[in-house]
Each structure stands twice: as C-alpha cells, then as structure tokens.
Amino acid sequence: MSGNQYTEEVMEGVNWLKKHAENEAFSFVFKCDNVQLNGKDVHWNNYTKPIQNEELTSLIRGAQTAMDQTEEEEMDWESEVDSLAKKQVQTFDALIKKCLFEVFVSKNIEPNECVWFIQHEWGKDQGWHCHVLLHSKNLQQATGKWLRRQMNMYWSRWLVTLCSVNLTPTEKIKLREIAEDSEWVTILTYRHKQTKKDYVKMVHFGNMIAYYFLTKKKIVHMTKESGYFLSTDSGWKFNFMKYQDRHTVSTLYTEQMKPETVETTVTTAQETKRGRIQTKKEVSIKCTLRDLVSKRVTSPEDWMMLQPDSYIEMMAQPGGENLLKNTLEICTLTLARTKTAFELILEKANNTKLTNFDLANSRTCQIFRMHGWNWIKVCHAIACVLNRQGGKRNTVLFHGPASTGKSIIAQAIAQAVGNVGCYNAANVNFPFNDCTNKNLIWIEEAGNFGQQVNQFKAICSGQTIRIDQKGKGSKQIEPTPVIMTTNENITIVRIGCEERPEHTQPIRDRMLNIKLVCKLPGDFGLVDKEEWPLICAWLVKHGYESTMANYTHHWGKVPEWDENWAEPKIQEGVNSPGCKDLETQAASNPQSQDHVLTPLTPDVVDLALEPWSTPDTPIAETANQQSNQLGVTHKDVQASPTWSEIEADLRAIFTSEQLEEDFRDDLD
C-alpha cells in the first residue's frame, strides 16, 4: 500500500514513534489490589469518591472524552464493560498523571521536557494495571528506584483520598501502608549474574510502544479476555486513535524501521560455547597477541622495539606489569607448542642470498673443516636435533679447550631461534626457572651436574617433566632441544667427593658429541646472525631434510657418541659457485679416497732427471751419529748407501726415455 492511503493521524503517530525510537525510558507499572480491612472489602473499583480539585476533574474529563471517542461502531465495548469500571479507569488515569506531575515538580523538571505514554490494561490474573513509559534527558538510570518510591508514595496517598469505602483514620493509614509496602508501583529491573542484585532496566520508547502496546486488543469482555482500556501520551497521538489504526501504525513502524540489508553472521562453536559478550579490552589483548606471535616477539625488549604502542597501552592500564607478563607468556607458549627451533631458524632465511651462499666458506663450516670433518654431515645432525627428530639424543654438546669456537656457534644458533631459555647454574634451587615455554634451552659452560643429574638427563633426552619455579608452583617443560657448551668432561658426575660412573653412559646416549680442539685465530670473529638460517635453508634445498630417516638415508646410521664426523670424506669442490650437485664418497671404498694426481709440467720432468746433488755428509755417517746418541754400537748398525750409489742404481734400472714416457702417460 502506498503512503497516500493512510490517514494523517496514522502517519503522525508513525513519525512520532520514529522520532523517539531510540530514547531510553523507564517502564513503570501501577496496580491496585483488593484488600480487606477489619471486615471491609476494598476493591480496585472503589476509588471514585468525588473531590473538589479542578485539575483532577479536568484530567478525568479528558480521559472520559478519549474513551468515548474510541468506542467501536458495534458498541460491544460499551455493552460489556460497565460504567463503574469505565469511571474507575478514567479516575486512575487522572491520578497517574497527577503523580507524574508531582514528581516533575520535586525534581524541578518542566513537563514539556518529558515524553510519556500511559496504557490501562486488564489481565485475567492480574486484573487492572497500568503501564507508564517515561523519558527525559534530566532523568538518569540511577534515579529509577528513587522515582518508583516517590510515585508509590503519591499513588498510595491519592488512593486513600479517593477511596469511596467508609474507613476510619486507622484503616486509612493501614491502607496506605499496604500500598507502599506491597509496592503497588513497580519499575522494570534485571538481576545481575555476579552481584545478584536488581538494577533498573531501560527500554527504547518508540520500539516498546510499537512492538508491544499497540499490538494489544481492546478489552471487550473483562471476565473472558485481556486487553487495554485506554491509551494516552504526551504528544496526543494515540489518545483518540481507534483500534484498527493502532495496528496500522505498528505495522508501518515495523516495516520502516526494518534494516535494508540483513548481515549474515556465522557463529563458531567456540563463540556459542562462550555465550558472553567480549569486552573491548579482551579484543585489544587478542589483537596484540596475534601481532606478537606473527612478529616472533619473545622478550619485553623485543616488544618495546617492535610494538611500542601496544606495550605503552598495556603498561598504562591498572595492573599493567602483570598484564604484560601474562601476554608475553601466552606468546612464548604459542611459539613453543606450534613451532620447532629449526622452523624458527628457517623462517629467517634470506632467499635472495641463498643462491650465492657458499656453505663451505661459512664460519661454522670453516671451524668444522679445520678438524677435517664432513661439515654437511655435522650441520645435518644439528638440524635434526633442533627439529626434535634426534630421538633420545636431544642435546647438541660442543666441548673442548677454550677459543675453539664452541660458544660462537651456540650463540649464533640461539640468536637465530629467538625463543631461548638459559640454564642458571648460580640458582642452585631453581636452575631451570627460565626454561619453560621455550623452543631451545641453552646451557653455557656446563660443569658437574651433581645432584641435578637426573633432571639434566630427563631434559637432555627430550622428556616431559615438571620443575619447581621460584615464587610459583611447579610447571611442565615440554620436549625441548638443548644446546650445551663446556670445557669439562660432563660425563663424569661427582656428588660430594664420590664419582658416579653409572651416569656416564646414559649421559653419552643423550648427547650429539661435537668435540672442537683446533684453536681459532684471534681475528676469526663471530658467526653472522644470517648464517644459520642460510645453512638450514641450504640443507632443505639440497635434500637434507631435518628428520632422522633422511639422516640415515644419507649417512647410513644414526649419530653416536664416538661418531666419526670425518667419514665419509667430502670433495673440496663441494658447494663451490660452479658446483650444482653434491657428491660424497663412501667410507667403505678406499679407492675413492685417493688424492687426484697432480699433472707434472715439463720443467718438473727435467728437474727430476737432473743429477742429484751429493750431500756433504754421507747417510752412513748420519746414521752412525744417531746410533751413538741412542747408545747403539757400530756393529749393530748396517751401513747405508751414499746418495751417489742410490743415483747410480736408479739410472741403471730406468733410462731417461723410460722416465719421460711414464711421466707423459700420467699427464694424459
């Protein structure tokens, strides 16, 4: 239907409701129960005593006019509802308005500054009652209970004044006490779940009228059904409106206030289970936590540098220090449970530098090359441990003399991981206080385990154990790889003055033994922070996955305590810029380990064929001198040939043409 088919009265009612749609209003209910005082029955319709009050008389006359004008054509309402009930409703309407005006005067509020709506209804169980909606900018939610008490007082006083039953002064006082104590005026409230107290609940003025009051039917049979008698409001929009027009206003208001597009929201199972509204503080903390995890923030210093705004925001809140600590603990816990140390290192690899990365010339591999080791094999074994694939051998042990590169390799690995916990030997009672929720445990300069040997063995083997923390309860350490450096023999455990050899083999079974003995030059420097990410990326690129199955595929067996890192030997050309494929030589094939023959140039051939120079001292004399120094007699020493004799014998066996032909064959 088009808007032109509706009456002006209907459209004005719709616009008035839309104007006050979102206004918050108090919702009061007035009632009048049947009571008995000393055998005298006082019913709800016994309050029609005439009174000489022009204002009250004028209000009653206005309510009477409104009821007469809204009667239906069939006159069913007139025939079913007796005149006494109609007169009582009109009187109650005047009394309620009188109570409102008296409250306005007590609060110094002008009546034209308030918006109100009154509807008298009849219920099967409750009988007569009246709903009152009241909105004013000068009335706050906290004043709701005070307003109820004031209206209840005025309401009881007017009821006693207009009671048509002949009551004594004592009975009148008793009637007023009953009205006030029984709360014949109530206000809409809700009960708080935590405090278990009742608080005033505000309603939307326009929505409440359109969706609730205007949809009710007009009362026809007081004993058979429920409905409304009369409606009045401060805007005079529904005082004289008929029943059909009221429904039309409600329908139009509902259609016009309906949102144009309905957003479809998907509620997850977790949100349904939570069943509560998240506060802005919770949402802010969750957003901050996601940012910290994505940026791999694991310390307060990293947080200050990478996310200073969120750090200051939390620090400024009440209990900010605890909030920062707990948020950071959740971040480290998330990284420890979802990522391995190898994965955290691999994330930091610069792929643009990987193309020209020379593994053999990296500082870490230079240290391994000094010992004649297969540096790829060593790096592959370390990567497996960092990825929690070493099984019981969950610890990388760098040991040996000072200045051999133990700490600089361990430090580079720890910096690349980031989320690292350090063992504190000075804290005798709580040495692993910093090692919970970490991706790597770093033990620098480990010494005698002593009475903590069992804890060490459990952590070094990757077991889940619980440890005590200072000022807190016990906390669980999940399987975490360990990197350890030491100058001592940690396999020897001393408790007091007694050695415990039974711990030696279990400790060896838990260690990836890397013994460094070659002292580094003073200008060797530190390992670059980008080196280990590139090493891990290089291993993955060339098929050396960080799993023990892949390790045994390449190197034949799992690493042991006395692992020979020099076998199989590796060619010096490996990983040179022009080398594409990696080739290793098996230790079981001795021929493959022979050095490549160096071609001889012609000048070298001529030098070999020239006559040898004769030493001043014969070999026999040198032998005699050495034998005399050792206390050996000349008889026991066999005479050695001179250089001239050796040269003559060689030339007698091989001619110059034969020697030159052999050298040419080698060159080919």
Swiss-Prot record:
Phosphorylated. One of its GO terms (biological process) is symbiont-mediated perturbation of host apoptosis. The keyword Iron-sulfur does not apply. ATP binds at residues 400-407. Residues 21-260 form the PV NS1-Nuc domain. It comes from the Viruses. It holds the Pfam family PV_NSP1. Its main location: host cell. SUPFAM superfamilies: Origin of replication-binding domain, RBD-like (SSF55464), P-loop containing nucleoside triphosphate hydrolases (SSF52540). This is Initiator protein NS1. It comes from Mink enteritis virus (strain Abashiri) (MEV). The gene is NS1.
